A protein has these predicted regions:
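A Rossmann-like FAD-binding core segment of flavoenzymes
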Residues: 101, 105-113, 121, 129, ...
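Beta1-alpha1 glycine-rich phosphate/pyrophosphate-binding loop at the start
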Residues: 28-105, 190-231
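C-terminal auxiliary extensions adjacent to catalytic cores
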Residues: 379-429
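Glycine-rich dinucleotide-binding loop and its adjacent helix/turn
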Residues: 138-212
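A conserved FAD-binding loop/helix module that cradles the flavin
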Residues: 325-360
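FAD-site-proximal beta/loop scaffold in flavoenzymes
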Residues: 153-180, 274-339
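Active-site-proximal substrate-binding core of FAD-dependent oxidoreductases
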Residues: 349-387
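N-terminal export signals
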Residues: 6-27
């Protein structure tokens, strides 16, 4: 039988319940959730975690995931694929465990609209689903008009590979087929964007591949920013492993790209006009399309939420987790999305049961490979301060600058272990 003690126990086992989640935080009037329905739009790191943990906290809630893809290829780890360290199968996960072990409904359709007054979601096959609470985890979309000459169509020639799948495989193919001694050029995105260290891990993994297969190739990055996550660690690793192979230029160098000639594989910036054999354009980003359609975004193009529960500030009863939400200092990453998913699940279940949501602390961990046996990491811990998630002073940190190659190898091993652990927790257990 469900009661507040069982809820607290389940949340503690999941690592969500904090010291604030004592009995004093809970209402004595626990409502029955029998027959309550939660619909989750999106089956990635955030959405799948929310769905699983709602069922884990309260198995009586009916949970449905709406996800058009029957398998999910992760962005975390996709840079490793470019270096030939893992294959597509390693990065691809299905929904069978969520269905069979957790009794979650998974419908492989696209959500086309939401009627907030009637609390229904309409799918592209015309099916209409009722909900008591809605969770939206749609990931990102791109601002295709941010650079003159670049478009969704152009990405079939100059891939972004910032949504894992065919784009990842296209970029890998281009890297493998690049002429000996050729040039790889990355156009990095402006803030905010998915996975802060991701572009620089990608440069590293392309260099790792070239070092083995195309040692006279060169790599250049034009970046509209002047600094990036783990910058000194990346640059130190680049010098140590690749010498002068990787050149990075920032905004202060005039490296903001203003125009791209797709046909001639040429990019224009104040810094220079550059032609390359392979060009990886990672565009400016915004919340996933369905978030705009539902009306969950503000003028920033992202979704404002109450950062202690991840409930939308614009529409009560609708929650947003993952890359699309505005989560204060918490970065946009797969780890963040999954942690947010667990806290959001707790918020949904406490709300449905008439309990108070405890104060939360969240965490983000990000491992990056600079080489196949050279890893670095960053950890952040966050808590709401005046309604905004801010870093906890003295908590977290980054890999030390002066480390032995054996220590870097250990961190590389930790990166693979992290990936296996988080994907198992979400999709395979």
């Amino acid at each position: 039988m469900f009661n507040r003690r069982s809820l607290i126990k389940a949340m503690a086992a999941a690592g969500v319940a904090g010291s604030a989640f004592g009995l004093q935080a809970c209402s004595n009037n626990v409502r029955s959730t029998s027959g309550k329905k939660v619909v989750v739009i999106g089956g990635g790191f955030g959405g799948s975690t929310v769905a699983k943990y709602i069922k884990r906290y309260d198995s009586s809630v009916d949970v449905t995931i709406i996800e058009p893809k029957k398998t999910y290829m992760t962005c975390p780890g996709s840079n490793w694929y470019l270096a030939g360290l893992v294959d597509v199968e390693y990065l691809t996960h299905d929904y069978e465990s969520l269905k069979s072990e957790h009794d979650i409904n998974v419908i492989h359709q696209m959500a086309t609209s939401v009627d907030k007054a009637k609390q229904t979601v309409t799918l592209d096959d015309g099916q209409v689903l009722a909900y008591d609470r809605l969770v939206v985890s749609p990931g990102i979309d791109f601002r295709w008009d941010a650079i003159e000459g670049y478009s969704e169509e152009a990405s079939e020639t100059l891939p972004h590979a910032w949504k894992a799948g065919p784009q990842t495989e296209l970029l890998a193919k281009q890297i493998k087929e690049m002429p000996q001694g050729g040039r790889f050029l990355m156009v990095a995105p402006p803030n905010p964007f998915r996975c802060g260290p991701g572009p620089y891990e990608r440069l590293s993994m392309v260099a790792d591949y070239f070092k083995r297969h195309n040692p006279t190739a060169t790599i250049m990055c034009l970046d509209p920013k002047n600094k990036f996550s783990k910058q000194s660690l990346f640059m130190g690793g680049w010098r140590e492993l690749y010498g002068q192979m990787i050149e990075w230029y920032g905004a202060i160098d005039g490296a903001t790209v203003t125009k791209i000639d797709v046909e001639n594989k040429t990019v224009y910036s104040e810094f220079d006009t550059i032609t390359a054999d392979v060009i990886n354009v990672i565009p400016a980003q915004k919340a996933g399309k369905i978030a705009f359609d539902i009306g969950l975004t503000d003028d920033s193009g992202w979704c404002p939420v109450h950062q202690g529960t991840f409930e939308s500030k614009l529409h009560k009863g609708i929650y947003v987790v993952g890359d699309s939400c505005i989560a204060g200092a918490m970065p946009k990453s797969g780890h963040s999305a999954s942690v947010q998913g667990k806290h959001c699940a707790a918020a949904v279940v406490t709300d449905l049961n008439g309990l108070d949501m405890p104060a939360i602390r969240t965490v983000n961990t990000c491992y990056s490979l600079v080489g196949s046996e050279y890893g670095i990491s960053v950890v952040g811990v966050y808590e709401p301060v005046d309604g905004v998630l801010k870093g906890v002073e003295g908590a977290g940190g980054v890999s030390k600058g002066a480390a032995s190659l054996e220590e870097r190898k250990q961190e590389a091993n930790y990166a693979f272990s992290w990936y296996q652990s988080i994907t198992k927790d979400i999709w395979h257990s």
